[in-house]
Amino acid sequence: MAPLVKNHGEPQHAKILAIGTANPPNVYYQKDYPDFLFRVTKNEHRTDLREKFDRICEKSRTRKRYLHLTEEILKANPSIYTYGAPSLDVRQDMLNSEVPKLGQQAALKAIKEWGQPISKITHLIFCTASCVDMPGADFQLVKLLGLNPSVTRTMIYEAGCYAGATVLRLAKDFAENNEGARVLVVCAEITTVFFHGLTDTHLDILVGQALFADGASAVIVGANPEPKIERPLFEIVACRQTIIPNSEHGVVANIREMGFTYYLSGEVPKFVGGNVVDFLTKTFEKVDGKNKDWNSLFFSVHPGGPAIVDQVEEQLGLKEGKLRATRHVLSEYGNMGAPSVHFILDDMRKKSIEEGKSTTGEGLEWGVVIGIGPGLTVETAVLRSESIPC
C-alpha cells in the first residue's frame, strides 16, 4: 500500500499514545481448571460432563487465565455456582465496585507511560459488559483517578467482544474533532456474571468456562502529538463496522436473575471465515482501495477461540506466525472480551522492540484490528505503525 501523504498544516489522524493492561491477581492454569471447576460447583460425580470439559480445555489452546472469582468467594456465595439460582444481585454488588477498580489499574499504567498530567485528559470512554449501574463505571473511574469533573464521559454497556475496536473508532472521532483532546479509553471485564454451575441442558457453559477470562485495558488517544513529549505507538487511520448477515444467533447473551445466560453457536468460525475477506477489503477501500496482500499487514484479531483465529488465518491465506500476538494472548490470558485486542497490540509493540523491528507493528507499516462479537458484529480499525528509534 502506498503511504498516505500527510499535510502537516492540517490535523493528523488520531494516534494511540499509550497502552496499559491489568488482570486480577488470581491465575488459573488450564490443566488444573477442570479439577477446580468441578470441585467448587460440586459436580465431581459428573464424569460424563468432566470428560467433555477436559476435551474442550485441551482444544482451547489456552495455557492460563486470570479470574476475580476464588473458591472462597464461591463458598460464601453458593447461588453463583448453583445453576439457575437467583444470583444477579450478588454478582452485580460485587462487579459494580470491582470492574472500575480493575479499569483503574490499567488506566494508571497507560497514564504513566503517556507521561502527561492527568488534568490533560479531556474525554473518557468506559466499556464493559460485566455490570450495569447508575451512575456508571465511567463515573466511578472519574472518582478513582481524580479526573476533572468536567471530563466528557461516554459509557458503553453490553456491546461485547467487538467493542475493543469500537472504542478506537469513537476515540478517533473525539480526538480529531476536538482540538487538543486527549481521550482515555478503558475496557474492563470481570466474567463473574457469566459463571454458572454445570448442567446437561446448557452445554454452552462448558465452552465459556474454558475460554472466558478477566482483564482490563486502557489506551490514550490524541491527534497532533506533542513533539518530543508524547510518543505515539499506532495511528488510527480508518474504522468500519458491519453485521454479518443471518448470524444473529451466533453469540447471544441475556441478563437473567441467574446472571448472564449465553449461547455460543458452533457456526461462528464459519460465519467469520466466510466474510473476513469481504469486510477487510471494504475496510481498506476507506484508505486507498488497493491493498489485497494480507500478509503485508500486522493483525490484532479478537481471540474468541482457536477455531475463529484459525479461520481468519486460513481464509486470508496468512503465513505461519502472522497471528503470533493474537495466539499469544489467547494462550496466556484467554478471551477477555473487549480488552483482548488491546492486549494484543501491547504485546506486539513490546515484542517489536525486543526483536529490534523497525516499527511497532512487527516491522510492518500497515495493520488492522478485528473485533468480533454479538450480532455477529465485526468492527475493524486500520492502523499505521510508528517507527522505533534505533
From Swiss-Prot:
Q: What keywords are annotated for this sequence in UniProt? A: Acyltransferase, Transferase
> What is known about its induction?
Up-regulated by elicitor and by endogenous H(2)O(2).
Keyword Transferase among UniProt keywords: yes
- Pfam family of the protein (one): Chal_sti_synt_N
Q: What is its EC number?
A: 2.3.1.177
User: What InterPro entries would the database entry show?
Assistant: Chalcone/stilbene_synt_C (IPR012328), Chalcone/stilbene_synt_N (IPR001099), Polyketide_synthase_type-III (IPR011141), Thiolase-like (IPR016039)
Give GO terms for biological process.
phytoalexin biosynthetic process; polyketide biosynthetic process
**What is this protein's function per UniProt?**
Type III polyketide synthase involved in the biosynthesis of the phytoalexins bisphenyls and dibenzofurans. Can also use salicoyl-CoA and malonyl-CoA to produce a diketide intermediate yielding 4-hydroxycoumarin after cyclization and enolization. Can also use m-hydroxybenzoyl-CoA as substrate, producing m-hydroxybenzoyl diacetic acid lactone as a derailment product. No activity with p-hydroxybenzoyl-CoA, CoA-linked cinnamic acids or acetyl-CoA.
> Know the name of this protein?
3,5-dihydroxybiphenyl synthase
The primary gene name is: BIS1
